[in-house]
Amino acid sequence: QQHSVDAQKIEYLPQYAAARFDEVEQIQNEKSTIDLMFAGNIGAAQSLETVLKAAEILREESNLRWHIVGDGSELNNLKKMAEEKNLRNVIFYGRKPSDEMPQYYAMADAMLVTLTADRFISLTLPGKVQTYMAAGKPIIGAATGEIPNVIDAAKCGYCANAEDAKGLAEAVLKFIANENRRQLGENSRAYYEQHFTRDMFMNHLEKELRCYGYKKEGATV
């Protein structure tokens, strides 16, 4: 509607997650720390300063750790910000090979997703959300638009408004207070299986290609 495109000409085909995340080990209840993790590109659009501001608000939560895995244009700025604020419980890992990522996911009690408060960016659903769900992880976010819609529909976590550090901190406290956090992870995985699997993606894509008369080499689809 915003771009005067006929809705009948649009098909929603969300990204699926790599199969390597299907067997991520889940955290045991005996763990004494709460480990939150962001994994992915670290750029301006991701608004990770919101995470660091939330970490500052919650600095007295001594059992809380924030893990940031990835690289990007804002990484050095974030490291500097964390150092200036003396956020010793924020840990940066840099970029890691994709085949090592499941072991990092296994560390996390919940995954983080944040976006800048941009009305066009809010229309997107970052691929990390599907990956988080494939791994069976609860999600804590600070974003507007599609991300909170999915988190709410899946009943897999909590989401504050974009760039709202206080709201993100409150969402983290709600997660910590939830004695049934494991259920959030199970809900996350269940929603992934219902909406974001590779088979569903390929079947949907093939269906749409059939509608447009696409032909494979040597065969009609």
What are the roles of these predicted feature ranges?
Residues 13-16:
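Carbohydrate-associated surface elements
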Residues 174, 198-221:
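C-terminal alpha-helical cap of glycosyltransferases
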Residues 153-154, 158-165, 174-179:
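Conserved acidic donor-binding segment of nucleotide-sugar-dependent glycosyltransferases
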Residues 33, 62, 67-69, 76-103:
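Nucleotide-activated donor-binding/catalytic signature segment of Leloir-type glycosyltransferases, i.e.
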Residues 167, 174, 180-195:
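A short, well-ordered alpha-helix in the C-terminal region of glycosyltransferases
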Residues 34, 42-57, 76:
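A conserved mid-protein helix/loop that constitutes part of the nucleotide-sugar donor-binding site
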Residues 110-113, 131-142:
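Short hydrophobic beta-strand element within catalytic cores of glycosyltransferases
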Residues 1-9, 19:
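A short, active-site helix/loop in glycosyltransferases that binds the activated sugar's phosphate group
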